[in-house]
Amino acid sequence: MFMKKVLILLICLIGYRIGCHAQMADEHYYFKNLSVQNGLSQNTVNAILQDRQGFMWFGTKDGLNRYDGLSFRKFKHDDRTRRSIGNNFITALYEDAKGDIWVGTDVGLYIYHPEKDSFRHFAELSVENTKIEHTVTAISGDNKGCVWVAVESQGLFCYDLEEGKLRNYTLKNFPFISTNVQSFVFDNSGTLWIGCYGDGLFFSKDRLQTLHPYVSPVDNQKTYENDVVIGLVKGAYNCLYVGSLKGGVKELNLTSNKLHDLLSEDENGESVFCRELLVASDNELWIGAESGLYIYNLRMGKYVHLRSSINDPYSLSDNAIYSLCKDREGGIWIGSYFGGVNYYPRFYTYFEKYYPKGTDNGLHGKRVREFCQDNQGILWIGTEDGGLNRFNPKTKTFSFFTPSSAFTNVHGLCLIDNHLWVGTFSKGVKVVDTRTGAIVKTYQKTDSPRSLIDNSVFSICRTTTGDIYLGTLFGLLRYNRQSDDFDRIPELNGRFVYDIKEDSGGNLWLATYANGAYCYNVSEKKWKNYLHDENNPKSLPYDKVLSIFEDSHRQIWLTTQGGGFCRFQPDTDTFANYNLSAGLPNDVVYQIVEDKDGFLWLTTNNGLVCFQPNTGVMKVYTTSNGLLGDQFNYRSSFETEDGTIYLGSIDGFIAFNPKNFSENKFIPSVAITDFFLFGKEVYAGEPGSPLEKSITFSDQLVLQSNQNSFSFRVAALDFQAPKTSRIMYNWRALIRIG
């Protein structure tokens, strides 16, 4: 008799979602690309499926892939085990009522059993004494519990899941149709529609006892004769959408039996060679073609044509679109021939992105530093690497201010009447007439003590009294209108003045890059310097102050280069400080903007923060939520009258309006995706494996006492912003000896 110890682990996982998502009315399409560089087995994606667990499946020319939002698991043929798939060239995917996944290949059909984590070759013999041996072109189910499979040169197969009986409709008894079925679909009445290679469109109302070609009631012609009908999908309002290689995309009204042409030629007069169709909503049809992606608004009769752009990282990765799938979050997956898979999260685009695309009418420079709106509503945008841009918020178009080619590093902007004062790095101040675009004045450092103290001007501020202050690398200047020169403020001599702000009381606040903050009290005509004191937690948190902001409640806020941000408390002449421990993602805070609801938006070195001043609650947005980049830039923000907020970063700038945000209530399912013993991944059915079935479907796990080094990989099956999901877990261990 010997003793053994068994450890039973019971695992409870709960997934929950944090975050809000929205879609702006003027919609832009930003895609996330997944390719072999991200773990995909091959870049030609022929088929896409989301299973009932929430996993995404991608069939390629070299393997089947399961994606959980963070990583891929690849399924390929392995001679060492009979549990693997028998062929790597995947052509079609379908999940049946039992949850099994049917996998079509270029040589036969396989069924993946998720609980067993294994594949089975579907080698059943049909009643007609045939079996599936050639390329599977399509798989789908009907409302009678049957799975239908289209196979090249073999017609259609129908498998009854309950009876386990296979029928083969070779179509050879219909001389007017070939056996090369490319697509098929059942309409609401149960009629089977079949698209063939070179023979057109057919339908059967009696499960292929009879078969009829589609004939247009308008001209009594076989509309799709000699065409390849490659896409068939059922739409709303009793219609079908038909895509073909020659005829583009048409809508077939099943009530009138009439065809309506939707898209046969694109905006350039080029033929649309349709590859795939997806009804994204009752009013929106997505069309995958050889020439890109077409998003067709069925209500308005208009479309958007999206193509790959080598200079645009958010564009499609390839123009040949072969597969489409809408997931349960509302996101759409686009499989391409050369570029892997692209993902468009429906609620991911409320951060509108602007970045250089290599075009003349695009943004010049991507290190966006300053925004300033002129009297015509044009937004002037200063960059640190591309000069000065003019942006029209209504048309969303750019024009480059050509003279700024001579001063590409812009640091400060201030509009004074119709003149834009431009502070530059090492090139002094340029004064631009915004009406004519002419540079009417240049101020630079000379031998005169009343010239600029330094040619690097980082901030410009006009006060309510009309005074103009300039912050430079070596001090503060006040412009003298009468003599058209500058007075140097001795209290700030030698100080790197980074920001200047006049508060509602007329006091002047200065942010310096090494000497804390200064405040000039206009009534007392005195300067006061606020510095960090490591022994005083209510002092300024850091001496490198980046910006100063006054909110609608007349509270003064300061941001710093390494101490977070703070709120000035005038009653005690102290500061309330907020840093990493308060919820900031990073202690470098660049800028603050207040929205119409009183929330403060803070740009940081690691994301965007929405801060509620009354509660201290912070919410962090990152690239996972749709930001252009996680690192923002200095003194780079602007808010329009309608509440649109512009924020600059080192990659361009974003625009958004918080009023358009809506909560995403989708709760992702949570799955254990992988199990490791002693650092090695273990699968069900392997010799010595403790797994009786797939770890994803295991509710308990029995381990021997010597199997004491193990780990799991867990995923919240969320694809819009997978890194924002949080997982709670509870371990319960039962040790049994006997």
Give the location of each predicted region:
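Residue-level detector of Asp-centered blade-edge/turn motifs that repeat once per structural unit
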Residues: 50-53, 95-98, 141-144, 186-189, ...
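Solenoidal tandem-repeat scaffolds enriched in leucines and small polar residues
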Residues: 137, 148-154, 176-183, 188, ...
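Loop/turn residues immediately N-terminal
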Residues: 62-64, 107-110, 153-156, 197-201, ...
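Trp- and S/T/G-rich repeat-edge/linker motifs of beta-rich repeat architectures
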Residues: 26-36, 71-77, 117-125, 165-169, ...
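Residue-level "micro-hotspots" composed of small/polar
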Residues: 20-52, 56, 77-90, 128-133, ...
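Bacterial Sec-dependent N-terminal signal peptides
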Residues: 1-29, 48, 55, 148, ...
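Conserved beta-propeller blade signature
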Residues: 55-57, 100-102, 146-148, 192-193, ...
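Short loop/turn segments that connect beta-strands within beta-propeller blades
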Residues: 68-71, 113-117, 160-164, 205-209, ...
